[in-house]
A protein has these predicted regions:
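Conserved donor-binding/catalytic core segment of Leloir-type glycosyltransferases
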Residues: 4, 209-227, 232-236
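A short, well-ordered alpha-helix in the C-terminal region of glycosyltransferases
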Residues: 350, 363-378
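Short hydrophobic beta-strand element within catalytic cores of glycosyltransferases
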Residues: 293-296, 314-324
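Conserved acidic donor-binding segment of nucleotide-sugar-dependent glycosyltransferases
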Residues: 336-337, 341-348, 357-362
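Membrane-proximal helix-turn-helix segments that form the acceptor-binding/catalytic region
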Residues: 77-87, 103, 107-111, 123-127, ...
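Nucleotide-activated donor-binding/catalytic signature segment of Leloir-type glycosyltransferases, i.e.
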Residues: 251, 258-286
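Donor nucleotide-sugar binding/catalytic pocket of nucleotide-sugar-dependent glycosyltransferases
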Residues: 34, 52-54, 125, 144-203, ...
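N-terminal subdomain of nucleotide-sugar transferases
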Residues: 1-52, 163, 169, 193, ...
Length: 401
């Protein structure tokens, strides 16, 4: 089978896109169409994957390159590149990631008689709503990030596509509530590959400083307001009074990083909160390995109530106990697997309680074992890879019939 996979950002790199492509190339020929904001070669063949990038212009043209690659269904550069790739490769199936280019994929798929599978890694309308909640109204947001328009696009897309991949049970339930036939929705969760829980050779660490009585918590991901990092910082201030060795290590970057750094300065927590910035994924994983507890403090918004962060399973796969907010998917998994503690979203006092409950090493080790076992038995990419391959076979077969 020949598959055209559409991804609206640069590649490399995205952990889910990489896992999906690595799995698909084991049995199929895969052509990935992606953005080219980093001005890479238009075509590249790597790890058995055909990578087709959008055209780009020189840096002297400023932000024109961003306009060329803007992921809108009517962008002629996307339409042409996707159309050309599908025609030349003679693709049998289109797999499109998230909503921005779903209509493009569906339109081309209908014209060429090719089935379209939609990978809904995000609740896109709710994610944009979270962005508005912090940034407020602006003309730009109204024109290109309008939740009402995006919800309309979503409702049409989920009805027209041949099959949908959902990342968690709560997302599947939401899609069914929108009128999607349950038979057209399959779970492919953001689980780690088996390599994640195999102990690799250590490289001497990546800069996490700790003392003999330290308790190190790690947050891995984008630095945005709805991810609850402010709550985590305020909780560290409370815990520090009883446990001076507590430390929060933050790995990542994002639009609200400056706000969080300012808060750390205002609370005089420079010795208790460490920002490592964006790290290569292998180095970020090593930071988790050097830490004691994994943290997922996301606000329980509609977005985080219907999606699941990769980092939860990364923490669990390496035997780290987790502290999560009461966003529905993370709360459900942590309670079912008994691999950590749940706190009330946006409640720094309750998060401080959860941190202190993991002060004992024996408690952390027991919860860490439960999380690791859950990944080994259920929440791993071997399981989800089988589901992914099955779905694409079904989609291709249904259109032929």
């Amino acid at each position: 089978m020949i598959i055209c996979h559409i991804w609206d950002a640069d590649y490399p790199w995205d952990v889910r896109v990489e896992k999906i492509c690595d799995s698909l190339v084991k049995k199929h020929e895969v052509h990935l169409v992606c953005r080219n904001s980093k001005r890479r070669p238009r075509y590249e063949y790597a790890k058995s994957l055909h990578i087709h990038r959008l055209p780009c212009v020189s840096e002297r043209f400023g932000s024109l390159n961003n306009l060329i690659g803007f992921p809108a269904f009517f962008n002629p550069f996307w339409v042409y590149t996707i159309w050309r790739t599908i025609k030349r490769a003679k693709a049998d199936v289109i797999l499109v990631r998230d909503l921005p280019l779903a209509w493009t994929a569906l339109g081309i798929g209908r014209l060429l008689g090719i089935p379209v599978v939609l990978d809904m890694a995000e609740n896109y309308p709710a994610m944009i709503k979270d962005l508005w909640a912090r940034q407020g109204f602006s003309i730009l947001n109204f024109l290109v990030r309008n939740p009402s328009v995006i919800r309309f696009i979503e409702r049409a897309s989920v009805r027209w596509c041949d099959h949908i991949l959902a990342v968690v049970e709560e997302s599947r339930d939401r899609l069914i509530s929108l009128g999607v036939n349950p038979a057209r929705v399959s779970l492919v969760i953001n689980t780690p590959t088996s390599a994640r829980w195999v102990e690799p050779p250590r490289d001497g660490g990546v800069g996490v400083s700790r003392g003999p009585q330290s308790l190190i918590l790690v947050y891995l991901g984008l630095l945005e307001w709805a991810r609850g990092i402010e709550t985590a910082i305020r909780a560290i201030q409370r815990v520090h009074e009883r446990l001076p060795g507590v430390k929060l290590v933050i790995v990542g970057s994002g639009r609200h990083e400056g706000d969080f750094r300012l808060l750390v300065d205002q609370l005089r927590l420079q010795d208790s909160v460490q920002f490592l910035g964006w790290l290569d994924y292998s180095k970020a994983i090593e930071v988790i390995r050097e830490s004691d507890v994994g943290l997922v403090p996301h606000h329980a918004t509609e977005s985080w109530n219907t999606t699941i962060p990769n980092k939860l399973f990364d923490y669990m796969s390496m035997g780290k106990p987790v502290i999560v907010s009461n966003a529905k998917p993370t709360e459900r998994i942590v309670r079912e697997e008994r691999c950590g503690i749940v706190f009330e979203e946006k409640n720094a006092e309750d998060l401080a309680r959860a941190i202190l409950a993991l002060e004992r090493k024996a408690t952390r080790e027991e919860m860490g074992r439960c999380g690791r076992d859950a990944v080994a038995k259920r929440y791993n990419w071997t399981v989800d890879e089988e589901q992914l391959l099955r779905v694409l076979d079904i989609a291709a077969g249904s259109r032929k019939q």
